[in-house]
C-alpha cells in the first residue's frame, strides 16, 4: 500500500484519534480497554454477580449488548416513535445466568438505558467513549463470523457461497465507524452496496430529494471504502465506475459481483484485530493491571498475553464438546474465522478443525432452551505462539498484482504457501467482458491468470514465542503443501439469519 503514510493506523481509527505516535496509540487503546474493564466490574457489582458468574462469557455478552443497545441512538429514537407492544424504549436487558444449588438458572434483567449510559460514562472518565463501544461491536462481529456461515445472505444478493471468506464483519451495525469499516471484508461491502442499488431499482424515490442526496453521499462513501480495500489499479478503476454511475442499476451489480469474485485471488486488504469479551478486560483491571500506563495493542502480543492469564467460563449444552466451544471462542478472540487452519493450528498449538466438524452450537443461549441440563466449563483460550495481525490480503507481491490465498483471508502475518486450484475459480469468469468496464475486466482476468500458486505469502514472516514480546526471533513454520485449511468449506454451519 503506497498510501500508507496518509492512512491512520487502525488503532487510531479504533480510538477516534488523530495521527499519533506508537506510544500515544498504545496509551489510547489502553485507555479504551480499561474503560471497558471498569464498566464491566461496575456492572458485576450492580448485578451482584459472584466471581465465577462474572467470568461467564454468556453474562459478559449480555452486559455488552445492554450497553450497545443503550447507546444505539437511532434505534432508541425509532422505538420511541413507533411504540411496539411490550417493549419499553427506555429499558434494556437480557439473560443473566446464576449458579443456584449446583444448577445454572437464567434470570431476565431490565435496566434503564439512562442508568447504563451513566455507568459507562463514569467508567470512561465522563466521556461517551464511542471507541470502546465499537470495540465491543467488533468482538460480537468476530464471534458471529466464527459461528455462522452467511451462505443464505450471499445467495440472496446474487453472490455465491464460495465467497464466504470475503464476508468478515457482515453483521457489524452501520454505526461502527472507521474502525468497523476497516474490518469489513470485500464481500460485506459488496453486499451492502448491492442491497442499496436494489432498493434504488425498486423504489424510484430512493435517490431523489433531500433524503436521496444523503443516500447518494452514503453510496459514494461506501464505494470509496471498498475501493480502498482493493490493491490493484484495475479493481480500483472499476470501483470508480460504480461510484460515478448516474443511476446505479444492474450493470453496477454485475460489476460488483465480478469484483467480489476477483477478490478471491486478488485479495483486498482487510484489518484484523483481537477484540476480547468485556469480562477479560474486567478481570485484568480488577487484578490491578494498568492498561493506560502499560499501553495496549490489538494487533500485537497483548491480547495473547491477556488470554494466557484469564480464566473464562462458558455454559455448555448437554451434547456439546467443550474443546470445540473453546476453539470457537479462540477464533473469535483473534478474528481468525477466515484464516488458514494450518496457520491457526500452529499458533494455537492444538489442531483447529473446520466448522463442519465442530460439535458445538453458538455461544449465546436462546431464551427457550432448557437450563436444567446446562453445565459450565473453562474455555481454553491460551496459545502456543503469538503472531502479528495483518491487514494485507496476503498477496504474494504487493507491488504487482499477485495471488492471495483463495478461501482464506489471512489474519496473521505468517509465511504460508498458497495451495489453490486456480481452475475452479477461473471457471467463474467465463463469459461477459463486454460493456463499459470491459478493458478493466480483461486486465483483472489477465492478472488472475498469471497468479502462481507456487508462491508464498508473507515471505519470511513467522510466529513468536510468548516470551518474545519484542518480536525478535521469528519462527517460520513449514506447512503441508496440498492441504489448504479453509474453515467453512464442505460445511453445514448454522445460518446467522435463522
Swiss-Prot record:
Its main location: virion. A motif (Unconventional nuclear localization signal) lies at residues 1-18. Pfam families: Flu_NP. Keywords: Capsid protein, Helical capsid protein, Host nucleus, Host-virus interaction, Ribonucleoprotein, RNA-binding, Viral nucleoprotein, Viral penetration into host nucleus, Virion, Virus entry into host cell. One of its GO terms (molecular function) is RNA binding. GO terms for biological process: symbiont entry into host cell; viral penetration into host nucleus. A motif (Bipartite nuclear localization signal) lies at residues 198-216. Late in virus-infected cells, may be cleaved from a 56-kDa protein to a 53-kDa protein by a cellular caspase. This cleavage might be a marker for the onset of apoptosis in infected cells or have a specific function in virus host interaction. InterPro entries: Flu_NP. Coiled coil: none annotated. Residues 1-21 are annotated as: Disordered. GO terms for cellular component: helical viral capsid; host cell; host cell nucleus; ribonucleoprotein complex; viral nucleocapsid. Homomultimerizes to form the nucleocapsid. May bind host exportin-1/XPO1. Binds to viral genomic RNA. Protein-RNA contacts are mediated by a combination of electrostatic interactions between positively charged residues and the phosphate backbone and planar interactions between aromatic side chains and bases. Encapsidates the negative strand viral RNA, protecting it from nucleases. The encapsidated genomic RNA is termed the ribonucleoprotein (RNP) and serves as template for transcription and replication. The RNP needs to be localized in the host nucleus to start an infectious cycle, but is too large to diffuse through the nuclear pore complex. NP comprises at least 2 nuclear localization signals that are responsible for the active RNP import into the nucleus through cellular importin alpha/beta pathway. Belongs to the influenza viruses nucleoprotein family. This is Nucleoprotein.
Amino acid at each position: 500500500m503506497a498510501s500508507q503514510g496518509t492512512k491512520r493506523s487502525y488503532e487510531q481509527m479504533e480510538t477516534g484519534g488523530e495521527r499519533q505516535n506508537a506510544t500515544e496509540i498504545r496509551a489510547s487503546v489502553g485507555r479504551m480497554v480499561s474503560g471497558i474493564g471498569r464498566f464491566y466490574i461496575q456492572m458485576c457489582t450492580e448485578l451482584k454477580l459472584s466471581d465465577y458468574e462474572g467470568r461467564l462469557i454468556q453474562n459478559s455478552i449480555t452486559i455488552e449488548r445492554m450497553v450497545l443497545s443503550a447507546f444505539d441512538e437511532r434505534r432508541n429514537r425509532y422505538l420511541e416513535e413507533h411504540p411496539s407492544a411490550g417493549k419499553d424504549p427506555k429499558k434494556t436487558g437480557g439473560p443473566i445466568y446464576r449458579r443456584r444449588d449446583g444448577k445454572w438458572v437464567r434470570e431476565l434483567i431490565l435496566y434503564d438505558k439512562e442508568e447504563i449510559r451513566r455507568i459507562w460514562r463514569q467508567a470512561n472518565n465522563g466521556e461517551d467513549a464511542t471507541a470502546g463501544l465499537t470495540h465491543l461491536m467488533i468482538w460480537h462481529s468476530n464471534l458471529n463470523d466464527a459461528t455462522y456461515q452467511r451462505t443464505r445472505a450471499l445467495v440472496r444478493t446474487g453472490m455465491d457461497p464460495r465467497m464466504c471468506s470475503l464476508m468478515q464483519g457482515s453483521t457489524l451495525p452501520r454505526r461502527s465507524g472507521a474502525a468497523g469499516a476497516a474490518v469489513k471484508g470485500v464481500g460485506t461491502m459488496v453486499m451492502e452496496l448491492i442491497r442499496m442499488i436494489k432498493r434504488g431499482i425498486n423504489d424510484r424515490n430512493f435517490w431523489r430529494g433531500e433524503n436521496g442526496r444523503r443516500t447518494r453521499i452514503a453510496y459514494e462513501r461506501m464505494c470509496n471504502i471498498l475501493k480502498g480495500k482493493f490493491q490493484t489499479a484495475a479493481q480500483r478503476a472499476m470501483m470508480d465506475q460504480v461510484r460515478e454511475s448516474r443511476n446505479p442499476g444492474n450493470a453496477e451489480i454485475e460489476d460488483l459481483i465480478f469484483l467480489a469474485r476477483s477478490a478471491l485471488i486478488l485479495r483486498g486488504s482487510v484489518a484484523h484485530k483481537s477484540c476480547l469479551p468485556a469480562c477479560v478486560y474486567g478481570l485484568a483491571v480488577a487484578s490491578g493491571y494498568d492498561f493506560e500506563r502499560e499501553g495496549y495493542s490489538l494487533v500485537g502480543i497483548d491480547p495473547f498475553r491477556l488470554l494466557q492469564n484469564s480464566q473464562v467460563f462458558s455454559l455448555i449444552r448437554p451434547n456439546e464438546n467443550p474443546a470445540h466451544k473453546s476453539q470457537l471462542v479462540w477464533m473469535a478472540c483473534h478474528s481468525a474465522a477466515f484464516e488458514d487452519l494450518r496457520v491457526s493450528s500452529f499458533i494455537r498449538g492444538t489442531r483447529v478443525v473446520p466448522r463442519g466438524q465442530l460439535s458445538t452450537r453458538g455461544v449465546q443461549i436462546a431464551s427457550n432452551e432448557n437450563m436444567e441440563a446446562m453445565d459450565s466449563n473453562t474455555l481454553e483460550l491460551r496459545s502456543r505462539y503469538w503472531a502479528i495481525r495483518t491487514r494485507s490480503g496476503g498477496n504474494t507481491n504487493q507491488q504487482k498484482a499477485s495471488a492471495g490465498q483463495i478461501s482464506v483471508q489471512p489474519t496473521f502475518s505468517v509465511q504460508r504457501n498458497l495451495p489453490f486450484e486456480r481452475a475452479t475459480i477461473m471457471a467463474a469468469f467465463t463469459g461477459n467482458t463486454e460493456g463499459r468496464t470491459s478493458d478493466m475486466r480483461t486486465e483483472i482476468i489477465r492478472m488472475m491468470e498469471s497468479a502462481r500458486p507456487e508462491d508464498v505469502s508473507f515471505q519470511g514472516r513467522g510466529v513468536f514465542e510468548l516470551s518474545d514480546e519484542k518480536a525478535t526471533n521469528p519462527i517460520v513454520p513449514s506447512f503441508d503443501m496440498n492441504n489448504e485449511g479453509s474453515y467453512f468449506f464442505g460445511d453445514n454451519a448454522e445460518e446467522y439469519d435463522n
